[in-house]
Amino acid sequence: MTENIHKHRILILDFGSQYTQLVARRVRELGVYCELWAWDVTEAQIRDFNPSGIILSGGPESTTEENSPRAPQYVFEAGVPVFGVCYGMQTMAMQLGGHVEASNEREFGYAQVEVVNDSALVRGIEDALTADGKPLLDVWMSHGDKVTAIPSDFVTVASTESCPFAIMANEEKRFYGVQFHPEVTHTRQGMRMLERFVRDICQCEALWTPAKIIDDAVARIREQVGDDKVILGLSGGVDSSVTAMLLHRAIGKNLTCVFVDNGLLRLNEAEQVLDMFGDHFGLNIVHVPAEARFLSALAGENDPEAKRKIIGRVFVEVFDEEALKLEDVKWLAQGTIYPDVIESAASATGKAHVIKSHHNVGGLPKEMKMGLVEPLKELFKDEVRKIGLELGLPYDMLYRHPFPGPGLGVRVLGEVKKEYCDLLRRADAIFIEELRKADLYDKVSQAFTVFLPVRSVGVMGDGRKYDWVVSLRAVETIDFMTAHWAHLPYDFLGRVSNRIINEVNGISRVVYDISGKPPATIEWE
């Protein structure tokens, strides 16, 4: 019998902050399970979830507006600790009898708050001391409205010159509100405050660890599928690879992995996937060479969204054909992770906009003939990687830069042709190899090469050549929501450019993309 790793759990109500998933990841890093739900949950749903504590997230709305989101009243009647962050603090103050006003000046950026009263939330936590010995905390503010009067049964714990109620608390009811964001690294002691709330005030044990998550997942897979056979589309990406390893540990030879080689992968990637999972780890793998089929379906298509849909559709067709060849397969496994689940829920409720269609969930037929196994659907990407390490997958593979589901299909601009993919593969491999050699690979968040379908004049020896152009792209980002272009050294870029032009026959010019996000996206398509 495996330990119940969901026994202690935190409920995070999402009021729309860009940092809400970060709050959840921080709680998980503390070894405690949590879930992220939209703010408008019912009392019955909260009772059913039975949380050890509740966190109210930040959000972009103004609590002073008539129809702005509110926490369900039951949150304050459930008898568990509640932690309001930014907007979450404002709605808590307002709903419990305090007052919030729209501020003339928006407070955004670093601030130093002075702790004026003792509280379980910040006791013994400080960045510096005032002249008279009061603790100071360096925090990150991002708010327009501010609390101007706290509820009568609360005390002021900390304040700044412009924000009289930076932290408020009702110690008896274990209700706490902070006007800053403890989940971002700019709030230096933020993790300690979250730990104080989750571990001490809510009394949650650290049961959510990679080894225990694996034991739990294996037990749940065995319970769900029994002795049935399972099929998985293995791409070599992080999610499908960790899914494969978990299933292999749980059901061994009853798992069949289908590896569809679509001709849109990185250099030697197909061979590496087959070597590692087939030869090294001993998984059942069906290798389907399908390059010609994908390229034929993509012929003549220039639109990025249409290309994504075609690649998704052909993958499903090929995968379905292979599944039909296997006898008695009852289950389809997928590497769906928790952000996919959150994103799909947001799309269903109309609370988010689709910028690009999501490859993992986009095209699968609604009429599923098989049951669905999704062992990673409670996990964030960083948790999936830690589990992969625990299962024996190599670090370099798990911490590789992100690669889009449609692969080179969206890194070749416009129409996708075999010639373009072959050139791009080799150019990209040189760029990545040089980044690793210069110890720059782990210093950038993502780096890749893009094929531009334009020809440019070049000089080789005594002759002129009229060949293709590629662009190098490297970015630095924390969350991939915004990104800066990476300031790679000029001599490094020169070395990469020389190697590509000299070693990849067919490329005459290399450029470097210096666009940030926004306004540009990280991928070109």
UniProtKB/Swiss-Prot annotation:
Write down the chemical reaction(s) this protein catalyses.
XMP + L-glutamine + ATP + H2O = GMP + L-glutamate + AMP + diphosphate + 2 H(+)
Q: Which GO terms describe its molecular function?
A: ATP binding; GMP synthase activity
- EC numbers listed for it are 6.3.5.2
State the source organism's domain of life.
Bacteria
Which residue ranges run through the membrane? none
* GMPS ATP-PPase domain boundaries: 208-400
Ranges where the Glutamine amidotransferase type-1 domain occurs: 9-207
What keywords are assigned to this protein?
ATP-binding, Glutamine amidotransferase, GMP biosynthesis, Ligase, Nucleotide-binding, Purine biosynthesis
One Pfam family in the UniProt entry: GMP_synt_C
Keyword Nucleotide-binding among record annotations = yes
Give the pathway annotation: Purine metabolism; GMP biosynthesis; GMP from XMP (L-Gln route): step 1/1
Q: Where is the signal peptide?
A: none
Q: Which residues bind ATP?
A: 235-241
Residue numbers annotated as active site: 86 (nucleophile), 181, 183
Gene Ontology, cellular component aspect = cytosol
Functionally, this protein is described as follows:
Catalyzes the synthesis of GMP from XMP.
Q: How does it assemble?
A: Homodimer.
Q: What is this protein called?
A: GMP synthase [glutamine-hydrolyzing]
Organism of origin is Escherichia coli O17:K52:H18 (strain UMN026 / ExPEC)
